[in-house]
Amino acid sequence: MKSGLWYFFLFCLRIKVLTGEINGSANYEMFIFHNGGVQILCKYPDIVQQFKMQLLKGGQILCDLTKTKGSGNTVSIKSLKFCHSQLSNNSVSFFLYNLDHSHANYYFCNLSIFDPPPFKVTLTGGYLHIYESQLCCQLKFWLPIGCAAFVVVCILGCILICWLTKKKYSSSVHDPNGEYMFMRAVNTAKKSRLTDVTL
């Protein structure tokens, strides 16, 4: 009976770890779309005073931010690589712009806590999927079709105009009710047969 309770306890603990209820990794949304780009939100505990936060794309370091507290209440923030970041009381926001489908990857927030001790490293992350712009794809598909349809309509219009012009010209030439009637040429050199007949 005791072993059954022990297994049940381990099973519940495993479920809590997998769902992220213990470390809080599943309690917030990491990616927020912001002004045509993506804001990646990396959270840290409120009690942390000195830390290093790295934004990783796969295994590559994109951004590196270090917060240290010197003498007094001054705070110095070092950003080693070029990246736009924003620090708040319990999170660091990294901003990425001009992304396309090639930037889709796993992004991780690597937090190294220096103060308060003990030294601790946590890694949270998620997959950022970037869709190709739907308008761009639709234009790529419909632009050649639209151009081909325009050319076909122009050609058919020219053929129709030529046919109507020819039909109008040919019908006016043979119009029996027209102002001028075309007569057949008469050969005056022939003599009539009635002149030889006497009454």
UniProtKB/Swiss-Prot annotation:
Glycosylation sites: 89, 110
Extracellular domain ranges by topology: 21-140
Stored InterPro entries: ICOS (IPR039943), Ig-like_fold (IPR013783), Ig_V-set (IPR013106)
Induction and repression of expression: By phorbol myristate acetate (PMA) and ionomycin. Up-regulated early on T-cells and continues to be expressed into the later phases of T-cell activation.
Signal sequence, renumbered to the chain: 1-20
Sorted UniProt keywords: Cell membrane, Disulfide bond, Glycoprotein, Immunoglobulin domain, Membrane, Secreted, Signal, Transmembrane, Transmembrane helix
Related illness: Immunodeficiency, common variable, 1: A primary immunodeficiency characterized by antibody deficiency, hypogammaglobulinemia, recurrent bacterial infections and an inability to mount an antibody response to antigen. The defect results from a failure of B-cell differentiation and impaired secretion of immunoglobulins; the numbers of circulating B-cells is usually in the normal range, but can be low.
Function: Stimulatory receptor expressed in activated or antigen-experienced T-cells that plays an important role in the immune response. Upon binding to its ligand ICOSL expressed on antigen presenting cells (APCs), delivers costimulatory signals that enhances all basic T-cell responses to a foreign antigen, namely proliferation, secretion of lymphokines including IL10, up-regulation of molecules that mediate cell-cell interaction, and effective help for antibody secretion by B-cells.
The protein's name in its UniProt record: Inducible T-cell costimulator
Organism: Homo sapiens (Human)
Lineage of the species this protein comes from: Eukaryota, Metazoa, Chordata, Craniata, Vertebrata
Gene symbol of the encoding locus: ICOS
